[in-house]
C-alpha cells in the first residue's frame, strides 16, 4: 500500500501525517509509512496492538510519540525494528488484557530516546515492570 485517502466528511476517522485515528478517543488506527520519520500526530491519545502499519517499514524508521499519547496497550510498538522517540516528560500508562503482562508494552529492545530531564522517570517506568532495564536508552 502506497496511498490511502479518507473523505473529509468521515464522521468517525480523521487523517493527519499519514496516520488515521478515531476522532472520539484519539485511538491510532493506521499508519502509512512513506519516509524514515514517522510523526504520530498530537491528536493521538492511545496506541494499541490493533494499529495497522503499512508502507516503507524497516529497521531505520524513527517513530516520534507525542506527549499527547497517554496510553499504550501491549504489543503496540515496532519491536526492535524502529527507533522510538518519546516526547512526553511522563511515560504513557500501560494497559494489558492480562495482569502482570504490562511488560509487553515496553520497547526495551528498541533504540529509545526520551527528554533529558525525563530519563530517570523512563528508567523507573521499565524497572516497575518486572525489574526490566532498557537496552538502548538515550536522551535528546
Go through each PLM region and give its residues.
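Short, aromatic/basic amphipathic alpha-helical patches
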Residues: 75-76, 96-105, 120-135
